[in-house]
Amino acid sequence: MSKAVIVIPARYGSSRLPGKPLLDIVGKPMIQHVYERALQVAGVAEVWVATDDPRVEQAVQAFGGKAIMTRNDHESGTDRLVEVMHKVEADIYINLQGDEPMIRPRDVETLLQGMRDDPALPVATLCHAISAAEAAEPSTVKVVVNTRQDALYFSRSPIPYPRNAEKARYLKHVGIYAYRRDVLQNYSQLPESMPEQAESLEQLRLMNAGINIRTFEVAATGPGVDTPACLEKVRALMAQELAENA
């Protein structure tokens, strides 16, 4: 069986939430919640936190996790993952966002199984259905797919354009990726494309190079932590979840 690892990029610096990976959520740093959920994903050999700050490294080691130091000049999580790829041997690398403490392990398992079911598949990601109102938000990245669930395009604009609104169905892109090793080996050689620069979406670099990205649709996911308001919402939801499971 192909070896799969989960890598959780965790930058300390954040303009809206400084020290974001270490923010407390129901008694644990956020990065610990993500790590513990990643450990629950079946079929994964290792889980690593990739960070650029010793404070995050120390926090991860304090709760018994594995952390790896990376450069602080990476432009994206994928660039950070490429550095990790040179240090951690695997066939499949799953890039799990460090600000998604409510990630469902079964969704990541769906992603991994899709990669294992089709050895020719280079990249995979997740999506879920959303309303037209949510699709109108530029902060929500949308994806249009074909009948095989392969991505045709990602955009911050509402796609497909609702010329016939009754027929439109919107899918939100969930920023979790699975990559084959060879894709990451070649990633740094791929030029930035005009769509990537215009939309500020790194996955468009892969699409511009003709690399297929398959999507797997899941149920609506929990909120990520992007702003102070998001943080308070996640704290409330996870406190409720903790109380229900007590």
From Swiss-Prot:
Belongs to the KdsB family. Activates KDO (a required 8-carbon sugar) for incorporation into bacterial lipopolysaccharide in Gram-negative bacteria. The lineage of its organism: Bacteria, Pseudomonadati, Pseudomonadota, Gammaproteobacteria, Enterobacterales. Transmembrane segments: none annotated. GO terms for molecular function: 3-deoxy-manno-octulosonate cytidylyltransferase activity. This is 3-deoxy-manno-octulosonate cytidylyltransferase. It comes from Escherichia coli. Its EC number is 2.7.7.38. It catalyses: 3-deoxy-alpha-D-manno-oct-2-ulosonate + CTP = CMP-3-deoxy-beta-D-manno-octulosonate + diphosphate. Pathway: Nucleotide-sugar biosynthesis; CMP-3-deoxy-D-manno-octulosonate biosynthesis; CMP-3-deoxy-D-manno-octulosonate from 3-deoxy-D-manno-octulosonate and CTP: step 1/1; Bacterial outer membrane biogenesis; lipopolysaccharide biosynthesis. It is found in: Cytoplasm. It holds the Pfam family CTP_transf_3. InterPro entries: Cytidylyl_trans (IPR003329), KdsB (IPR004528), Nucleotide-diphossugar_trans (IPR029044). Keywords: Cytoplasm, Lipopolysaccharide biosynthesis, Nucleotidyltransferase, Transferase. HAMAP family: KdsB. Gene3D superfamilies: Spore Coat Polysaccharide Biosynthesis Protein SpsA, Chain A (3.90.550.10). It comes from the Bacteria. One of its GO terms (biological process) is CMP-keto-3-deoxy-D-manno-octulosonic acid biosynthetic process. One of its GO terms (cellular component) is cytosol. Homodimer.
